[in-house]
Amino acid sequence: RDIATSLFVVKALRKKGKKARLLFSWDEFDRLRKVPKNVQEINNDMEKYIGYPYVDVPNPFHDEAQSYAEYFEHEFMRSIDEFGIELDYRYQAQMYRSGKYSEQIIHALKKRGEIFDILDSFRTQDAQPGEREAYYPVSIYCPCCKRDTTKITSLSDDCTQATYTCECGHEGSFDFTKDFNCKLAWKVDWPMRWMYEGVDFEPGGKDHAAPGGS
C-alpha cells in the first residue's frame, strides 16, 4: 500500500507537468533485533548476529545474495519488476558508510538537547535525572564485535569527536567527520532523510500517530 499510494501521487504530479521521483529506501543499516522463526529453522546459529546491521548479517538462504539484507532486497525487487514500477532506490548502508550524512549527524548531535526535549514531550513517564545530558541520537557500530552495543561517554564541543565504550569490552574514539560506521536513531534518521533528499510526501499509517510512534 505504501508504494501504491506514493506511486499514484507521483503519477498525478507528473500529469500536471511536475517533476517527481519515487524514492524507496532500504533500511539495511538498521540492527538485527531478532531472528524470525523461519530463519531460525534454516540456521539456528543466527542469534549471534543480533546487533549487527542487516547488511553485515550473512545470508542464511544459500543463494547468490551476499547478505541477509540483500536476499530480501532481491525478493522485493523481483516482485516490483513484475508490476513495472520504477523506484529510485537508496541503500542506507551505502549512504551512511560513504559519509553522505556526516554533516546531518553532526547537526543532530549539536541539537541533541532540543531533540531530547521534543521526544520527551510525547513520553508518558518523566525523564530520569541526567537522562537528557546522556542522550545521544546516534549509535556507533563497534569495530570489534560489529554490534551497536556501544555507549558514547564524551563528546567534543564542536560535536565532531566522541569517545565510547562497548558491551564487548572495547573502548575507542570516533571522528564523525572521518568515521562513518554509525547510524542515527530512527526518529531522527527519518526526518534527516527527508531533509537530505528534499522529500515532500510520504504515506503514513495510524501506527505512526500512536503514542511512542514517529
Label every model-predicted segment.
Residues 32-35, 120, 153-155:
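Short, solvent-exposed loop/turn and secondary-structure capping segments
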Residues 118-124:
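Short coil/turn segments at secondary-structure boundaries
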